Every structure is written in structure tokens, then in C-alpha cells.
């Protein structure tokens, strides 16, 4: 989540794109960086105003006299943020979160929290417009794991229903057929957290 001073944003919208060759950006601390085509940036119609998921730019930064704000709540590809962060030796609270992968459904929650905080600090604040651009849902991770594998690794035999119920409490959808559990992880565990049968095993082991 990042806030921009609307009066300094040129044009009617902000854009997320890869930087153009030889484009530059002045960061909040005054440092000027030279961008490459691999860097993801937030732009107005004039050019970059923030290094996506890492640092804000100085041009549209929030000042003491700011009264008109654009609130950007977004999600970015983990690899893109990681590569840009390494290139500029930048590691921020935001970039650390993005590098780990974020459930895209958390974007709505982030927006709601941002609005709530604005209203708490500035009760007179009015929200005049909203736009959802290029929404992409997090694909839920699907993993098949056999009952025999679980019994062997857990060191004890659990009832089929107990396994299904345990995973269900963690937000998984589970179907058991012919000795195989077909598990579908919740979105908030599908950004790299759950990807193989050992991950499913670990979820069960910590609760039984």
C-alpha cells in the first residue's frame, strides 16, 4: 500500500509497467536511480513515480500540506520485486512481504484497512473514487497425498475423517478417494507455502 499526493500526479490515472530504458526515478530520500526494463514501476503519464513494491518516489510524496491523496493497494510478482531489490540493494518492509508472495485476495483487505486508518486519523476524509485494475486471483494449490504416505511418516494410523477434518479446520478442501487425499489449499497458503505432499503432512502433524 502506498499513498501519493494527488495534486502532483500528472493525468487522471496511475499505471503499473516495466520501466523504459534510460528512465530515472528520484526516491523519497532524494537518491536518483537509473532504471532498466526489468524494473517494475508505478507511473503517471509523465513517467515513474515509485519503484513498485519497494520505495516511493519524491515527486508525488505526501507532504504536511497534502489534502488530496491517491491510495494504491497492489500485489506484485515476487520474483520481479526480489530482482529489482537486489539490483538497487534495497530491502524494505514492503519488499520483504512481496518477495515472500502475497495472496491477491488480501488486496481488498489492505484497501479496507487503509480506508479505516484514514478515517480514524482524518474523520472528515471523503473517498471519491475507486478502480480495480487487472485483478488476478491467486490459484489455489492442489496436492495429492496417499493415506499410506501419511501413516508411514506420521508413525501412527489416523482415521480418514480425522485427517480430512484436521485439514478442513485449516481452510483446505479435501476429497478422499481410493486411498488418496486430494487437497486444495486456501489462497492464503497458496503463494509457495503449500506445494508438495510433505507440506500437507506438516500441517496434519502439528495438529494431531
Regions found by a protein language model. Name each.
Residues 1-208:
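RNA/tRNA-interacting regions in translation and RNA-turnover enzymes
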Amino acid at each position: 500500500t502506498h499513498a501519493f499526493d494527488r495534486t502532483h500526479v500528472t493525468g487522471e490515472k496511475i499505471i503499473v509497467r516495466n520501466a523504459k530504458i534510460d528512465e530515472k526515478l528520484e526516491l523519497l530520500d532524494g537518491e536518483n536511480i537509473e532504471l532498466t526494463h526489468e524494473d517494475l514501476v508505478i507511473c503517471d503519464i509523465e513517467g515513474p513515480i515509485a519503484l513498485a513494491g519497494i520505495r516511493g518516489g519524491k515527486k508525488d510524496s505526501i507532504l504536511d500540506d497534502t489534502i488530496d491523496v491517491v491510495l494504491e493497494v497492489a500485489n506484485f510478482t515476487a520474483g520481479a520485486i526480489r530482482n529489482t531489490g537486489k539490483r538497487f540493494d534495497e530491502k524494505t518492509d514492503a519488499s520483504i512481504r512481496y518477495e515472500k508472495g502475497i495472496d491477491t485476495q488480501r488486496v481488498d483487505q489492505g484497501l479496507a484497512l487503509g480506508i479505516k486508518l484514514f478515517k480514524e486519523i482524518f474523520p472528515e476524509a471523503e473517498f471519491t473514487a475507486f478502480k480495480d485494475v487487472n485483478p488476478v486471483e491467486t490459484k489455489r494449490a492442489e496436492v495429492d497425498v496417499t493415506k499410506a504416505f501419511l501413516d508411514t511418516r506420521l508413525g501412527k494410523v489416523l482415521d480418514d475423517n480425522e485427517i480430512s477434518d484436521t485439514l478442513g479446520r485449516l481452510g483446505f478442501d479435501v476429497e478422499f478417494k481410493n486411498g488418496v487425499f486430494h487437497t486444495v489449499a486456501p489462497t492464503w497458503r497458496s503463494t509457495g507455502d503449500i506445494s508438495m505432499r510433505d507440506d500437507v503432512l506438516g500441517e496434519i502433524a502439528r495438529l494431531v
